[in-house]
Regions:
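Intrinsically disordered, low-complexity linkers and terminal tails enriched in Pro/Gly
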Residues: 1, 28-33, 110-115
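Structured beta-strand/loop patches that form or line metal/cofactor-binding pockets in enzymes
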Residues: 1-9
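Active-site- and interface-proximal helix/loop "cap" or "latch" segments in soluble metabolic
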Residues: 19-86, 90
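C-terminal charged interaction modules
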Residues: 79-115
Length: 115
């Protein structure tokens, strides 16, 4: 059986706030670690029936980038849900929520003249 690995390295400041996130994967084809400004990692514990999560972002992550990150993450979560359940109606609801979330964020930014 083939084994793959994903490695995540987080550089913290003196207050334990992430300054840099780098990741690499054995099957990525890249020799150098990839930089990221944010990450969300979730595991399902079947015994406890609960999600275990690690959410990190660097000091450099801007608010508009965070909104983009959440929008894209919500959309891809909806795609994953559809692939695993074939439930088109729930997938559409999730995608509608993601779009509404993003549109509301953009409207707030326009109102505050931040974009």
């Amino acid at each position: 059986m083939k084994q793959s690995s994903i490695n995540i390295n987080v550089q913290l400041d003196e207050d334990k706030v992430p300054e840099e996130i780098r990741w690499s994967a054995s099957d990525s084809g890249s020799n150098a670690p990839n930089k990221a400004k944010a990450m969300m990692l979730a595991f399902w514990d079947g015994a406890d029936k609960s999600a275990l999560r690690i959410d990190l972002w660097t000091k450099q992550m801007m608010m508009d980038e965070m909104a983009d990150f959440f929008y894209q993450t919500l959309m891809t979560m909806a795609d994953t849900y559809k692939r695993s359940t074939q439930n088109e109606e729930m997938t559409n609801d999730m995608k509608k929520f993601a779009k509404d979330f993003y549109n509301k964020f953009r409207a707030q930014q326009l109102k505050e003249n931040k974009i």
